[in-house]
Curated annotation (Swiss-Prot):
The keyword Lyase does not apply. This is Repetitive organellar protein. The leucine-histidine zipper domain contains 32 11-mer repeats divided by two 6-mer repeats into three blocks. Residues 1-70, 1520-1547 are annotated as: Disordered. TPR repeats lie at residues 1089-1122, 1466-1499. Residues 713-1076 are annotated as: Leucine-Histidine zipper. Its main location: host cell. It comes from the Eukaryota. Gene3D superfamilies: 1.10.287.1490. It comes from Plasmodium chabaudi.
Amino acid sequence: MIFNLKKSKKNEDGSNKDSKKTNETSGIEKKEKSNKWYNKIVNNSTKKDKDKNNDSIVYDDESKVGENDHHMKEYELEDQLKETLKSITALSIKVKEYEVKIEELEKELKLEKEKQINKEYEKELNEKSEFIKRQMELLKEKELNINLKENKINNKEIITLKREEKLNDIESEYIEKNKEKEKLNYEVTNIKMSLDKLTCEVQEKKDNLEKINKKVIEKENNLRELKEFMKEKNEIIESLDGTINDKKNAYEKLEISFEEKRKMIEMLDSKLIEKEENFANKQAKLEKENEIIIEKLKDIESREKDFKSKEEKFASMENELNTLKSDLSKNACQMEVYKLEIKDLSQSLVEKEREIFEIKNEYDDKINNMKEKLSSINDKGIDNTVLHSEEEKINKLLKEKETELNEIHKKYNLEIETIKNELNEKEEELEKNKKAHTVEVTNLTKEIKLLEKKTEDAKEGHKNELNELNNQLSKLNKEKDNIKNENTELNDKISSLNSEVNILNKDKQTLGNDIKTLNDLINNLKNEINTSDNKMNKMKEDLAMLNEEMEGKCVVIDEIEKKYKNEIFMLEEKLKEKENYADLNDEISILRNSIYVKEKEFIEMKEFYENKINLFNKNFEEKKNIYENELNSLRLKYDNEQGLIKQIDELNIQKLKTEEKYLQLYNDNMHMFRSICTKIDMPYSENIKGSDLVDFVTAYIKRRDESSSDANPDTTHKEMVAELEKRHAAIVAELEEKHKEEIAKLGEGHKEVVLRLGEQHKEETIILEEKHKDVVTKLGEQHKENIIKLEEEHKDVVTKLGDQYKEEIAKLKEEHAVVVAELEEKHKLGEGHKEMVDELEKRHADFVEGLEEKHKAETAKLEEGHKSEMNEVEKRHADFVEGLEEKHKAETAKLGEGHREVVAGLEEKHKEVVAELEEKHKEEIAKLEEGHKEVMAELGEKHKEVVAGLEAKHNLEEGHKEMVAELEKRHADLVAVLEEQHKAEIIKLGEEHKEVVAGIEEKYKVEAIKLAEEHKDVVTKLGEQHKEEIAKLEDGHKEVVNEVEKKNASLLNMLEENHKNEMIKLKEEHKESASDLVEKLYQKDEEVKNSNNKIEELTNVIKDLNDSIMCYKKQILEEVEKRNEYNEEINKLKIVQNEMKDMNDKKILEKENEIKKLNKKLSNYKVFETKENTYKNSEMVVNENKERIIVDSVCKENISESDVEGKGGNLKMTLSLKKKERNIFSINDNKNESSELVDTIKSAYINKIEMYKKEIEDNGKNIEDLKNKILDLSNELINLENMKNVLTDENNNLKKEIEIKDNKLNEKEKNENTEILNLNDDIIKLKKEISEWKDEEEKLTKENIKLKNDIEQINKEYKIKEENLMIKFNENINEVTSLKNQIEIEKMKLEELNKNYELLLAEKRETNMSISNDDNKIVENNILEDTDSKQNNLNKNVEDKTGDDINCEKNNDQAKEISYLKDEIKKISMLYGEELNRKNSYDEKVKNLTNELKELKIRNKKGEEAIAELNKLKNIKEKNKSVKQNDESSSNNIITKDGDKTPEYVSNDDKIQKDWKANLVLKLKEKPDLWDNINSLEKENFRVMSIVKENKNVQNDKIVGIYSYFKKCEKELKNDMLVICLVLKDILSILFLNDNFVNLFEKIDKILWKQMYIPTEIRILFLRYFSFLDKLRNYVKCVNEEYVNNERYEYSWALFQTYLETASNLKKEMIYYVLEKAEKDSCENNSSNFDKPKITDILNFSKDSIRLKTIAQLRKELNFEREAKNILNYDYQIILNKYHECLRKLKIVKNMARELDFNYNVSSKFSIKKELEMCSDENDEFKYNNIKNNEEKNDTIKDPKHNNLIQKIINLQRNKKTEKKKNNLVNEINTMYPGDTTPKGKIFTTNDNSKQNEILKKKDNINNNITHKNVYTGQVKNIFNEPVERKVRISFIHKSPFN
C-alpha cells in the first residue's frame, strides 16, 4: 500500500518557509506533549486549516469543508513521515561510512599481514590485542552489571505495575461506593418527591381517610412484629454468646491439658540430662584412652630422639677422624720444618769454618810480615839489644795472639761441638719423630680401620635399630590404626548417641512447636471469636440503626397522619361550604390507586429489609458452621495429639520400669556374688566366670559337709538344705516386696517434683515470651513510624528541591529565550551568532552541571542522614533484642540450675535409701549359708528369663525410639519454618524500605532527566536552525568560488597523477625484483639461523643426557649402600633373635628344674604315706570286722575325688583313713582300758597325727603356690612363643622386601644401560647433522654475494627509466594548458544559461499564482488550455537550462573526484616515503611499493574513465539541442467523454536530478538523525518511499518517488517526502481482521505488552494515525461481511488501542513492515521480453565506490604519528566488529531482495483496489500513458561516483534500443488518490490502442517508467468513509534509480 500524499505550495520567500516549518514543528511537539491520543491531533489539525486556506488545493463548492480537513491531516502525515525518514536516512549514511571504513581497514590489514617483518610491531600488536581483550572482558562485565541493573529495573517496574493495579482496584471500589451513594441520594429524592405528591393528593381527596387510618394501624402492627422479630434475633445472639463462652471454657481445658503435656516434656528433659551425663562419662573414658595413645606416641618420639642423638654421636666420631687426619698432615709439615732447620745449621757451620780459615790466613800473613821485618833488620845491622827488646815484644805479642787464637779456637770448638750436639740431637729427634710418625701412622691406620669397623658396626646397629624402630612404628601404626578404628567406632557410637540426643531434642522441639502451634490456633480461634463478636456487635448496631430508621419513619408517618387529619378537617369544612359531591368518586378512585401504589412500595421496602435480615442470618449461620467445623477439627487434632502423648508417656514409663528392674536384678546378682565370695573366703573380681564360682562353691560345701559330718554324724545334709531353701525363699519375697514399694514411692515423689518444676518453668517461659513479643512489636511499630516520618521528610525535601530547580530552569529558559531572540536579530544583521550561542551553551551547561552537582550533594546528604538514622534505629533495636535474649537465657539458666539441684537432691536420697536396703539385704543374705547349689541354679534360670524379657522390651524400645525420632523431625521442621517466616518478614521490611527510597530517587531522577532533555532539545533545535541558515549561505558562496578553482586544479592534478603512476610502476617493478632477491637472502639467513639453533639445542640435549647419566650412577651407588645397610640390619635382627631364643631356653630349663624339685618332694611325701599305711595295717588286723563296718560307712558317703587331688595321690582317702583310725582307737580305749600298750601307742600316734596335719597344711599351701607359678610360667612361655612367631614373620617379610628391591634395582640398571647406549647413538647422529649444516652455511654465503651484485644492476636500470618519465611529464603539462583555455570558454556559456533560468522561474511563479485564484469550472477549462501551451514553453526553457546545469555539475563532481584522488595519492606517497626512511630494509620497501602499485593501478583506471567522461561532455551538449526539440512533441493528453481534459504528464527528470544533486550535502548535514531512523526502520524490515518531486500545477498532480532502501538515492534527495510502504494483505493483520494475528495477540499476557519492543518512529505513527487506521478498518469491514460483528476482533482491537496509549514498546512479530509488492496487472502480458532491474542488482554495488579516508590519512590529520598504532588498533578491532555486523545485515537485505524479486509479479488475493473497483458503478480498463524522452539523457544522468554495476546497466540499456521499442512497459504507476472519483455517467476515455502503440513505437520514456492508471466512476466513499468528488487526478511515479 502507498500513502499518496500532496505537498502544499511553496512560498516565494525562503524566510516564510523556514518560519512556517518551525511553527509547524513546534506546534506538533506541543501537541505530542499535551495530547496523549490521536483525537486531539485530529481536532488540532482543523485549526491549522484556517491558516493554510490560501495555499491549499481548490475543490468544488460542494466538498470544500470535508476535503480541507482531510488534506490538513495529510499535511501532518507528510511532516511526521519526513521527520521519521530523515532519521532513517542518517542511519543509512552511517552504515555506509562504517562499511567504507571497514573496507579500507581490511586493505591495510592485508598490507600489514604481508609485511610481517617488524617483530617489535607484532609484539606491540599482541600487547594491544591482549589489552583490547581485557577491555572487552571489562565491557562484558559492565554489560553483565547493566543487565543486572536492567533486571532490577524490570522488577521495580513489575512492582509499580502491581501497585498501579492495586490503585486501580481501590479507585474502582471508590467509584462503586460513590455510585451506591448516588443511588441512595436518588432514592431519598424520590421519596421526598413522592411525599410531596402525597401532600398534594391528600388536599384534594377526602373519602379514603378511614382506609388510610386502617392501613396505618396495619403498619403499626407490622412495626410491632418487626420489633418482636428483633427481640428474637437478640435472643439468638445471646444464645450464641453462651455457646462462645462454652467454647472458651473448652479452650481453657485444652490449655490445662497442654500444661500437663509440658510437664511430661520436662520429665523427658530430666532423662535426657541423665543420658548426657552418661555420655560425658563415656567421653571421659575415651579421652583417657586417647591420652594413653598420646603417651605411646611420645615414647615413639623419645625413641626417635635417641636415634637422632646416636646419629649425632656418629657424626662427632667422623669429625674426630677428620681432626686426626689434619693432625697427621700437621706433623708431616713439622718434619719438613725440622729438616730445613738442620740444613740451615749445616750451612752456618760451613760459614763459621770459612771464617776460621780466613782468620788463620790473616795471622799467617802477619807472622810472615814480622819475619820479613826481622830479617830486614838483621840485614841492616841493628843492635842486638834493640833486637832483643823487639824480639821480646814480638814474642809477647805472639804469645798474646796465640792465647787469643787458642781462646778463639776453644770458643769455636765449643760452638762447633754444641752445634754438632744439636745436630745429633736434631737427627735423633728426627729419627724418633720418624719412628713415632710411622708408629702414629700405623696406629692411625689401625684406628681408622677400627673406626671404620665401628662406624660400620654402628651403622649396622643403627640400621638394626632403625629396622626395629620401623617395626615398632609399624606395630604402633597398626595399634594407631586400631585405636583410630576404635576411636571411629566410639565416635560413631558418640554420634549415634548424639543423634539419639538430637532426636530427643527434636522430639522436644516438635512437641514445643506443636504446643506453640496449638497456642497459635487457640489465639487464632480467640481472634476469630473476637472478630465474630465484633461482627455480631456490628449486626446489632445495624439492627439498632434499622430500628432507629423505623422509628424515624414512624415519626414521619405520624407527622403525615397529623397533616392528613388537618387537611381532612380543612376539606370537610370546605365540603360543608361547597357541597359539591360530583367529583368525589373520581377523587376517591385516584386516592385508592395512589394508596395501592404506596402499599406496593411499603411491601417492597418490607421485602427488602426482610431479605437483608435473611442474608444476615445466612451469613451468621455459615460462620457459625465454619467455627463449629474448625472447633471439631481442632478437637480431633487435640484428641489425636493427646493419644500420641499418652502413648509416649506409657512407653517412657515402661522403659523406666524395665531399666529399674534390670538395675535391681543386676545389683542383686552382684550382691549375691560378693556375699558368696566373702563366705567362701575368696577375693571378689568382676571378671570371675559363673562356672569357676560354681566350682569354688561346691568345694566349699564339701568342706563344710565334712566338718559338719564330723561334728554331728546323725543329722543329714538334705534336711538342712530344705530348711535353708524355705527360709531363703520367704526372706527374698519379703525383701522384693519391700524394695518394690519403696521404689514406687520414690518414683511417684520424683515425678511430682519434676512436674511442678516443669510447670513453673513453662509458666515463666510463656510470660517471658509474651513480654519479648510485646517489646518486639512495639519496636517494630516505632521503627515503621520512624521510617514513615523519614520518608515524608525526604519527600518534602525532594519536592522543595524539585520546585526550586524547576523555578531556576524556568528562569534559565526565559533568559535563554531572550538571548536567543537577541541572537536571531543579530543573525539577521549577520553578526557573530555562533560565538554567542557557544558562550550561552557553555554557560548553560556549566550552570546545569552546578545545579546537578548541588542536587547530587544534597541528595547524598539526605541519603546519608537517612541511612545513619536507619542504622541507629536498627542498632538500638538489635541491642534491645539482644538484652532481652540475654535476660531470657539467664532466667532459663537459673531455672535449669534449680531444677538440676532438686533432681540431684532426690537422686542422693534415692541412693541413700538404696544403700540402706542393700545393707539390710547383705545382712539377711549372710544368714543364708546353706543350700547354695539349688539357689544358684534357680537364680541362673531366673536370670535367663529376665534377660529374654529385657531383650524383648529392648526391641519394643527400639520401635519407641523410632517414634521419638519421627516426632523430633517434625519438631525441627516446624522450628525451621518459623525461623524462615521470621527471616522473610525482616527481609520484606528491608526490601520495602529500599524500594521506597529507590522510588523517590527514581522519580526525582526522571524529572531531572526530562528537564535536561527538554532544554537540550530546545538548544539543539536553535543550533540546527542556525547551522542550516549558515550552511546555506556558505554553500552558495563556496560553490561559486570552488568551481573555478577546482576545474583549474583538476587538469594539473591529472597530469601529475599520470606521471606519478608511471614512476610508481617502474619503482614497483624494481622493488618486486629486489624484494624477491632479498626474500631469498632472508630465507637462507633464517635457515642458517635455524641450523645454528638446532646445533645449540642438540648440544644442550647432550649435556642434559650426560647429567642424567651421572645422576643415575649416583642413585645406583646410593641404592647399593642402602642394600648393604639393609643386609646389616637383617644380620643384627638375626643375632637378637638368637639371643631371645637362648634366653627363652634358659628360662624353660629353670622352670623345668623347679618342677623336678617339686616332683621329688611329692615322691618323698608318697613314701612317707606308704610307710604309715603299712604300720596301720599291722596294728589293726585284730579289728577287721569293725574296720569293715567303718569302711562300709565311709563308702556310703558321696565324695568327689576330683576336687582336692595332687600329683602324688588322693588326699581325701588319707583323711578318711585317719578318721577311721580315730574311731578304732576310741573303741579300743573304751574296751581295753586296762592295757598299757594301747595307751602308749595311742599317745604316740596322736602326736604323729598332729605333726602330719601340720605338714599336710604346709604342703597344700606350697602346692597352691606352685600351681600359680606354673600358670605364670606357662603364660610367659605362650607370650614368648607369640613373640617368636611375630619376629619370624617380620624377618620373612623383610627378606621378601629385600628381594623385591634387588630385582627392581637390577631392572633399573638394565634400563639405564640401554638408555645410555641410545643416547650415545643420538650424539653421533647429531654430530653428523652439525657437519651438514656447516656445509649449507658456506653455500648460502656464496649465494648472498651473487644476490647483492644483481641488486646493484637493477638500481642502475631504475635510474635510466626515471629520466625517460620526466620527459613524458613535460609533454603532459602542455596538454593541461590547452584544456584550461577550453574550460574558460565554457564558463561564459554557463553564466548565460543561469540568467535564462532565473527568468523562466519568475514566469513560472506568475502562472501558478494566476491558476490558484480561479474557482469556477469554466475558468478551469480555459486555464487548462492556456497552461498546456505555457507548460510546453516552460519545459523548453527548463530543459535548455537543466542540461547545461547538469553538465556543469558533472564537471564539478568530476573535478572534485580527481582532486580527491590526487590528494589521496599524495598523502599515501608521503606516508610510505616516511615509512621507507624509517625502515631501511629492501624487503619492506618492495612490499609497500607493490601494494601501492596495486592500489594506484585501480585509481589510475578510475582517473582515465573520468577523463574519458570529460571528453564526452562536448558531444552531450550538442545532443541536448535535439532533445529539446523532441520533448516538445512528447506530451500525451487524456480526454474524458464529457470533454474534460486530463492533465499532461511531462517528465522533468533533468530538473529532478539537478535538485537531488544540488542539495544532497545540505540534506545530510541538516538532518543526520533522518538516516539513523531510516536505518533503524530498515533493521525491522521496514522500507520507505521518498517523494522526490511533485508538480506545482494543481491540475497535474504528478508525484515522483524513489525507494530509500536503494543506497544511491542519498545523492539525489533534496526536498523529498517519505511515505511508508506496507503489504496490502498485512493490513488485515494490523487491523485485527485475521484469526492468526488475533490468536497471537490473545496469547500475549497483558503485562508483557508493557515490556515489548517497538521502534519509536513506528509507535508515533500508530498513535498519530490511529484514527486513519480505524476508518480504514471500518471500510474493510463494510466491504467484507466476514469481519462484521466479530467480538474477538473488536475486543482485541480495543485492547490494542489501550496498549498503544500505555505501552512503550510492541512485539516485533505483531507488525510487519515490508516493501510494496506490485499487483498482477495487464502489464504481465508484455513482461516476457522486458529486462526488469532486480533489487539484488541494486544491492550488489562494488565496494570501490565507497570511499573514506584511509588509516594513513587519519594518522596524518589527527597528529597521531607515534600514538597512532595503539589508537588505530583499538579502533580497527571495533570497526571490524561493526563490519561483520554490516555484512550480516547485507546478507539479510539480499535475501529479502531475492524473495521480493521472486514474489514481485504475484498479486495478493485481497486488495483495496479490487474492492473499490467492485463497489464502483463502472469498471474501466487500466490504460497506459507512456511518455518518451531522449535516449541519450540516460547517459547524462550518470554520476561519476556511481559504481561499475550501474555503468553496466546503462550500457545494456544502450545496446537494447530495439528491445525497448518493442517492450513499451515502463515503471510509472498511476494510483488513485483517496478522493479521486468521477461523477456518475462520466467515463474517462483515452486514445485508441493503435494510436498508443504508434506513439510507443516512435518514442521510449527516458525513465523506463510504467504509468499505471486506476480510473473509477461514480460517487464512492473514500477510505475515511467520506463522500468525495474530485476531477483532479494524481499519479504516483516510481523513479528508477538507474536513470
